[in-house]
């Protein structure tokens, strides 16, 4: 059973799980892969429990005003808020939104653009579940971002 145990204080997060992590509003975020490989682009990210479970479980912590950019998955994605206050927005333009707090859950369907941002006043944490053993692929929309020049990265 020890290979099926994950203690949060022993998890090793990635501070650059996706290329957008170099941009303002995305820099102060940590991504944890707890069960399964998830969809992070960081090939060095530690996967705590590697055996197949029929889903992938991860976590995200972020400082205020930090989160993800608009993206979609080929699998369903469920967010379970553990602490803090998070804004979730979705749709091709990201104009639909809601605020979630500790204990709240939102399920995002496949192939729908979605994003999140910590709108609280301290570092906050949520757990993320992706359906299936194969977490699918991620599609990122950078249309809402002002990308920096090479000198700024």
What are these regions (language model features)?
Residues 68-70, 88-89, 114-120:
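Short beta-strand His + acidic residue motifs that chelate non-heme Fe in jelly-roll/DSBH
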Residues 143-149:
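Conserved small/polar residues in nucleotide/adenosyl-binding loops
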Residues 1-54:
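A short, N-terminal "cap"/entry segment at the start of jelly-roll beta-barrel domains
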Residues 76-102:
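A short beta-strand-loop-beta hairpin characteristic of the jelly-roll/cupin
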Residues 100-119:
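Conserved metal-binding segment of the jelly-roll/cupin
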Residues 78, 107, 122-137:
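A short hydrophobic beta-strand segment most commonly corresponding to one strand
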Residues 42-43, 58-72:
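Conserved short histidine dyad/triad with adjacent acidic residue
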């Amino acid at each position: 059973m020890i290979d099926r145990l994950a203690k949060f204080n022993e998890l090793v997060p990635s501070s650059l799980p996706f290329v957008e992590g170099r941009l303002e509003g995305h820099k102060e975020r940590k991504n944890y892969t707890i069960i399964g490989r998830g969809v992070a682009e960081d090939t060095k990210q530690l996967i705590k429990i590697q055996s197949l479970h029929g889903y992938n479980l991860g976590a995200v912590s972020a400082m205020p005003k930090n989160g993800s950019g608009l993206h979609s998955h080929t699998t369903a994605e469920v967010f379970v808020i553990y602490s803090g206050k998070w804004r979730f927005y979705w749709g091709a333009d990201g104009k639909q939104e809601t605020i979630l707090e500790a204990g709240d859950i939102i399920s995002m369907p496949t192939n729908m653009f979605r994003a999140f941002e910590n709108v609280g006043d301290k570092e906050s944490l949520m757990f993320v579940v992706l359906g299936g053993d194969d977490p699918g692929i991620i599609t990122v929309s950078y249309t809402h971002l002002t990308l920096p020049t090479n000198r700024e990265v």
